[in-house]
């Protein structure tokens, strides 16, 4: 599970075994693809030859027509035989295909027919596949014709000789620029090796030549699936419109339906695929995977048996089940399934790579490294994912490990001295609080890895940099997250992220890894808000505005909304509101019962009925009423007014309008800004006061309290500025600059009361734990309260941050140790201070006390 940054874009679906962020993909190639799709709506082009007509019939799924058209062609020609065999293979008639291919392959061992035979033998797990494919690949070095080069490329790719395949495809593409079949085959290999931008370019080149080339449409859909699922689905559906018998497209759409938690739809698509090809290995694998995650053990084994009856070494049937288990947070089971796959295909680099990723998510990093290194040894071609993972693990090996009970932290050595003081205590607080609330003690050890570089965090989770909107992830017993240094201070709440992910530890384990995403994410955001209300306010205003626009989600669509970049921010927030509604309606007992019901392996409809005797339709009514009670006044404060229209009004007109619309937040804010611009600060202040009364939880520098604080500063009204900054940081947790400004103002007005300054400094280090001044102040306040152990923690953090006055920092720490009776430690710190500043009087006095044994 992930915690997103609600201040920025969101990461699509998690846990994704295939989710990779490629900014260039979306920015540079997706838009032109729409043009290709529009062209694809054009009528079918007339074929210029019988062979082209037969090829067109195959691409569009008219397989019987392929047989008819082939009869008009040279029955001995390898290309004709290969096309006829492909039509048979598409319908699962493997024996028939083999019978027509083998004689021609024997006669022409480097022909298209030989290639199809080799690929068929490989799919069926036949021992002779390698020899057949090597014969097809052999002419690659001397081939000059595009078709010959492409044929060798396909054979080389099937053999796992990707560098040679790359050279063959490159030469074929140059020999026949834009050839749809060549560009598509080239794109498929690029996609397999995670080069999505180049893969999409190849698919687009194919579609520019032939907009109805269905394999290129499906390749495009696969390329887009992680970044833009709705568009990917639209592209795949277009391919299926052209070729209604396209099994690969049906299987792809089924996988997308699974991601959206539409399992019935997925099964229907897979059953349709099996009508076309009853022996489709991919369809059986996905049905088996669905049976597995639905705990239908007998059905799972039956589907596995069907696949293995076709291809006895088809380890993919277990690998796919493992992938889907991982997407459903069942990472230990994913490891077992990947290992079952390896019993059938021990040297499959893809399965080994999957095993490595699954092991990473269980916390077995040595095992993960071994699996990934073995995968890379078997297939060293341009796989940046595996290389990234190994590089990331090299980085992790340099981290400091901190063990505290069932918690194991891995922290960058540059940050460990500071972070371990806060993160360990916060994690214990979170787990203790939530374990009591949910009456559940999670199984440990719980590994928490905190990365100072966001890209290392992203690679740890999905193998590639990116995940721009994600802040943390949880895999049941493993938590990964950005450290406060991974992003500018004030851009995210690292403490909230840690709390959020530890809530996932509870819900994932408590449900036996079967909790749906809407519930586990909803609980995590809900628990953030329970811990500190200010953590959860960043979406309040946007949600109220969405209510006015009718853009909120139906509860039944909530889980699916997590798969779309457009709706995922709303999905997180609305899921938390639903959890709040569940607690208000059924109590914490009801929420606990719902989580435990999922552990029985039932779906959401059954879980709601069993645990709470309700369903989404009944919940929707009460939920809507609850939302209106909570957000109704704020929603009404935003109703109707257009910010641009208000900004364009002349000031007299705006004053008149605002007088008539006293309950309009946008109008009051527009008036305040206009009055401030026209040098009427007192009037502006009154407008902002009215705005603040309408929406007291507004955040950001343009919020009413932030604006009033600035006006007060301009007027040199420190008392009012302090009041406004206090109100501002109460609602806006992220603004570290405002908190620092507030401490400065308090000190300027002579305030030295720890009760007033302490909470502000606490806020500063909650946002930026690397602020030495705040730690120093908190340490000295703790000494005043006679809490030397708390003071020592703060002073240790100061020393770790490399203060300018190291002598004073050592002396501070020495005094805290002295006060707590740790005289040896106090003496070490005192000597350290004197080594820096031999005449430092405070250190000299303390050393004298220590030497003489005075209290």
Residues of each region from the PLM?
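Short coil turns that delineate tetratricopeptide repeat
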Residues: 75, 108-109, 141-143, 177, ...
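Conserved structural position within tetratricopeptide repeats
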Residues: 72-75, 105-106, 138, 173-174, ...
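Juxtacatalytic substrate-recognition/specificity segment
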Residues: 56, 201, 234, 241, ...
């Amino acid at each position: 599970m992930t915690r997103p940054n609600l201040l920025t874009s969101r990461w699509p679906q998690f846990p994704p075994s295939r989710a990779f962020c490629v900014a260039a993909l979306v920015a540079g190639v997706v838009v032109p693809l729409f043009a290709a799709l529009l062209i694809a709506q054009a009528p079918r082009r007339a074929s210029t030859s019988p062979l082209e007509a037969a090829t067109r019939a195959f691409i569009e799924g008219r397989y019987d027509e392929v047989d008819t058209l082939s009869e008009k062609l040279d029955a001995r020609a390898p290309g004709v035989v290969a096309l006829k065999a492909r039509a048979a293979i598409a319908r699962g008639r493997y024996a028939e295909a083999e019978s027509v291919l083998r004689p021609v392959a024997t006669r022409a061992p480097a022909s298209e027919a030989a290639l199809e035979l080799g690929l068929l033998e490989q799919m069926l797990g036949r021992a002779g596949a390698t020899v057949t494919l090597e014969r097809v690949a052999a002419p690659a070095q001397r081939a000059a014709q595009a078709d010959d080069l492409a044929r060798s490329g396909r054979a080389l790719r099937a053999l796992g000789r990707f560098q040679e395949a790359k050279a063959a495809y490159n030469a074929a593409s140059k020999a026949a620029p834009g050839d749809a079949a060549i560009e598509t085959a080239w794109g498929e290999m690029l996609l397999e090796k995670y080069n999505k931008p180049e893969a999409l370019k190849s698919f687009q080149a194919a579609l520019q030549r032939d907009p109805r080339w269905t394999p290129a449409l499906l390749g495009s859909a696969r390329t887009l699936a992680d970044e833009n699922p709705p568009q990917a689905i639209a592209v795949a559906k277009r391919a299926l419109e052209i070729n209604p018998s396209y099994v690969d497209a049906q299987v792809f759409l089924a996988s997308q339906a699974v991601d959206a938690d539409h399992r019935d739809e997925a099964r229907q698509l897979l059953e349709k695929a099996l009508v076309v090809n009853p022996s489709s290995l991919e369809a059986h694998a996905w049905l088996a995977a669905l049976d597995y995650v639905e705990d239908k053990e007998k059905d799972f084994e039956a589907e596995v048996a069907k696949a293995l009856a076709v291809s006895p070494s088809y380890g993919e049937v277990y690998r796919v089940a493992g992938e889907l288990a991982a997407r459903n947070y069942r990472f230990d089971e994913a490891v077992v399934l990947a290992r079952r796959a390896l019993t059938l295909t021990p040297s499959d680099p893809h399965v080994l790579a999957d095993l490595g990723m699954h092991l990473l998510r269980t916390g077995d990093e040595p095992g993960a490294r071994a699996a990934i290194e073995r995968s890379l040894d078997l297939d060293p071609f341009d796989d940046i994912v595996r290389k990234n993972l190994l590089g990331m693990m090299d980085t992790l090996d340099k981290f400091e490990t901190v063990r505290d009970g069932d918690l194991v932290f891995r922290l960058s050595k540059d940050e460990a001295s500071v972070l371990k003081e806060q993160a360990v205590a916060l994690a214990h607080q979170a787990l203790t609080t939530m374990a009591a609330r949910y009456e559940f003690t999670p199984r440990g050890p719980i590994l928490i890895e905190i990365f100072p570089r966001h890209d290392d965090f992203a690679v740890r989770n999905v193998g590639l940099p990116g995940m721009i909107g994600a802040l943390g992830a949880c895999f049941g017993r493993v938590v990964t997250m950005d450290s406060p240094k991974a992003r500018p201070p004030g851009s995210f709440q690292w403490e909230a992220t840690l709390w959020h992910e530890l809530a996932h530890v509870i819900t994932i384990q408590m449900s036996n890894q079967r909790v749906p995403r809407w519930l586990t994410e909803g609980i995590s955001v809900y628990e953030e808000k329970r811990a500190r209300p200010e953590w959860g306010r960043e979406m309040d205003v946007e949600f109220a505005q969405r209510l006015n626009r009718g853009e909120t989600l139906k509860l039944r669509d909530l889980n699916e909304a997590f798969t779309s970049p457009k709706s995922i921010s709303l999905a997180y927030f609305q899921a938390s509101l639903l959890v709040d509604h569940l607690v208000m309606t059924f109590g914490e007992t009801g929420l606990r019962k719902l989580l435990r019901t999922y552990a029985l392996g039932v779906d959401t409809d059954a879980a709601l009925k069993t645990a709470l005797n309700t369903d989404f339709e009944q919940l929707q009514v009460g939920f809507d009423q609850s939302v209106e009670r909570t957000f109704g006044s704020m929603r009404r404060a935003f109703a109707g007014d257009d910010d641009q229209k208000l900004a364009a009004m002349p000031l007299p007109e705006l004053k008149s309008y605002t007088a008539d619309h006293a309950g309009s937040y946008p109008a009051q804010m527009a008036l305040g800004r206009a009055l401030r611009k026209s040098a009427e600060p007192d009037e502006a202040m009154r407008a902002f006061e009215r705005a603040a009364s309408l929406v007291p939880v507004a955040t950001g520098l343009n919020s009413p309290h932030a604006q009033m604080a600035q006006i007060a500063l301009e007027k040199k009204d420190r008392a009012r500025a302090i009041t406004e900054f206090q109100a501002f940081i109460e609602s806006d947790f992220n603004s570290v600059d405002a908190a620092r400004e507030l401490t400065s103002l308090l000190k300027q007005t002579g305030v030295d009361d720890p009760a007033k300054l302490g909470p502000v400094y606490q806020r500063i280090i909650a946002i930026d734990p690397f602020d030495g001044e705040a730690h120093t102040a908190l340490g000295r306040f703790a000494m005043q309260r006679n809490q030397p152990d708390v003071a020592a923690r703060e002073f240790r953090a100061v020393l770790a941050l490399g203060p300018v006055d190291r002598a004073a920092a050592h002396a501070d720490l020495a005094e805290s140790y002295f006060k707590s009776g740790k005289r040896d430690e106090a003496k070490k710190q005192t000597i350290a201070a004197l080594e820096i500043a031999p005449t430092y009087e405070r250190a000299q006095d303390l050393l004298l006390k220590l030497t003489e044994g005075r209290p």
